[in-house]
């Protein structure tokens, strides 16, 4: 083992009491060591050409020294440190720390007992794989333990894209692979890098953030108890009801008057030690909860010393103290959990306000609350929040809304049965909803499991040996005449003993969150209800803090927690905007964006694409004359801003019926197989976009630009057409603009590739659908504007990207039967999205290997940081090694977080020098002090100008940094990239590689098809199947994107 750490996948760290040789002993573990590893001639056409007298724009780029013309003739894991021994693996041992949460003693053993450290298994040496080949497709990997990340030859230095069988002299196979090396399972040896310092570039300002300082005593203890309930309640709400009743009955007696906070599951935190180590209680609930008696067992489990938390916040200890922070967070949530509706980390109540958003739903208002460790200390992040709930209306009224029937009309004819489509729509909308009936003279609540396939008039059941209909039963028993007898009936209970509930006697119970996908009307209503300008939002947050009145909260006071009622104020900086370069043929060759936005007036694209073969198909009700005018204006706009766009379509522009989309597209492809661009005017109703994109991109190989009928399209709005032209240019392989100066002065001299990655998950209630992972990578150095995308399906809700790197076992060569019989000599084909993109970069950049790799990873929550670092960084390293064992580029891995609740507000509202037009902080505002992590490398960056509402800064957190960026370098790199987004002339809120990955993943969801048979077996190093201890569920393979489509930014 080498004696220095930090060179491997996971650099070695030094514990507070650590040794230096990678095997250090002591209560704080050791310091790990070791290295880880002119137009072409136009065809004669009968239809008119599209263009204007001064059209044409710039032609293709000329040869060196040529002149650019205009018009139609233009030329142009180490061991854990909890008191154990650290052993370096790959990159060495990790930081050692003393445990902060101590285990509770057994009932007969006085005093606390420390949690024992579990050692990791010894490392398996890296070995070489005898057969390496590139994979041309990005597909999900099978669930098997991944082989090691070594490779035999340099694929980058050989024929890229061709599968290679590596043999050792005389045609004999190379030495066999050894058994797979285990993925590291300990997180103690894995830690994000420390902050390299604070940024200094930019104009210094002061901002406020919706964080409130929390103070706790340095020497207090919080005691942890395990809670078990028998029989287990079905919901957390009942758990809390049981524990509230226990507190009411026994707080002053058996609990010794000590306050506690309950997490709604199995953890109970107390402000002092309870008079017992273990005790059972019997709690019986009232009639509303069916008078069930619960046995509650409370058993001491451990304690948290707040001293360790203070040491961590002060930067003197690396252990994150997450258990202690979680305990304090539960304490602060105890009172609102008993009084409000809980949705994740937010609390909602009608007392905060409600607003109708249409079609049977309403928006409830509330607040979000989360405790976080920051540089200024513990911080309570509070933000106003809104979410949709079911309106407490009759089920009949809801069904009318659901089916799009105005509530002031008579609605569907009760005498007419619902169509199969309507019945399925209602079934999906009402499944799992709790309803209340009052026809029995009392209130009864039921949970809907399904709706019947038969109408109410055909439902029979047996009672007292006789068979009667539901209609007869209600008439005789309740004197109630049912009207909607042709509609289906709600069904509750289980299939063997169903309970039939006519819709007209049921009302939806208040307080149920709607978690399914909203329609366009509801989305608009929700945005209207929640969108608030910065000054108003800040005031609402302060009012919410005052309403919560934390000093008067007995539980908070008993735990000796003090919360400031003033927003945190902190220094910030406004980074300078980059200068953009456009083509020299334009009147303006450079552009200095002001407040994050600019336009294309007097500018020409720096790399205008050439589109010779195109056409347009209209699926809407637009008149064909309007379609011709649109095409003419669009061609003119493209030529005017720098493209070379043929005025004559390849085949005549025409219209087709929306119900004949596949046939129409196929006919176009047959007539024009070399089509470069297809302009599609979408049908007037929604639902066709995905079908068009799937057929064009995976079946026909057509790059398409869809246009939605509307006012801007019909009026031929100039700004609209310019934005469409920007998208068309990059889809055709062009480049809109580039940065005038290097991305980072002094920071990216070497060849660099920038990746973006994201995973999108199916909508709530659609868990049978796969999650889609997408990885994009820049293909042009040094401009860094063109990104190639690959996509892959993986198991539902799986956040770890499984297909970054894969190794697929292949059959043994027939010339080596003995090796095959031995069972240990295996050949593999290496693949995966990361590897394929690296190879594409190599082939497109004069066979230059990137020396720096920057990986922006979107969609990862705080709790997934170590998991992503363990598996995805491992996959990245293996993919690099599989190309060339001697190839060791420097990798930086940055998590991009947009779904957080931190908001930045200007020091003084209304001052033009401090805000943009919307009243938000100016683009380029960066914060890396008070509200950021105590010791790790992170920052908040507001890179865009607000349009409406309050801008949300993006949080960037560095998980791995071999490039050793300074704070200024990474912040400027990220901010400058935000000005290179291809689809608009604005800086964007998220760094473009991550933005593109999100677009690509979202696009790929349209590709989902029925299962396809596939006998290949592959294993992925980027997945967490090993951690899960079993095989992930099978997923449908995505259809392959055609090569000509995949090579351009088709997802824009």
From Swiss-Prot:
Tissue and organ expression note: Expressed in seeds.
GO cellular component terms, A-Z: cytoplasm; nucleus
Per its UniProt record, what Pfam families does this chain match?
ArgoL1, ArgoL2, ArgoMid, ArgoN, PAZ, Piwi
Gene Ontology MF terms in the entry: RNA binding; RNA endonuclease activity
Compositionally biased, Gly residues: which spans?
Answer: 1-39, 50-59, 66-81
State the UniProt keywords alphabetically: RNA-mediated gene silencing
Keyword Glycoprotein among record annotations: no
Span of domain PAZ: 394-510
- SUPFAM superfamilies assigned to the protein according to its UniProt record, in alphabetical order: PAZ domain (SSF101690), Ribonuclease H-like (SSF53098)
Q: Where is the composition biased (Pro residues)?
A: 173-183
- Cited Gene3D superfamilies: 3.40.50.2300, paz domain (2.170.260.10), Ribonuclease H-like superfamily/Ribonuclease H (3.30.420.10)
Regions of biased composition (Low complexity) lie at: 40-49, 97-117
Q: Where is this region: Disordered?
A: 1-127, 170-194
Alphabetical GO biological process terms:
regulatory ncRNA-mediated gene silencing
Taking every annotated instance into account, which residue ranges of this chain make up the domain Piwi?
Answer: 677-1009
| Role according to the record | Probably involved in the RNA silencing pathway. May bind to short RNAs such as microRNAs (miRNAs) or short interfering RNAs (siRNAs), and represses the translation of mRNAs which are complementary to them.
Name the family the entry cites.
Belongs to the argonaute family. Ago subfamily.
This one is known as Protein argonaute 14
Q: Which organism is it from?
A: Oryza sativa subsp. japonica
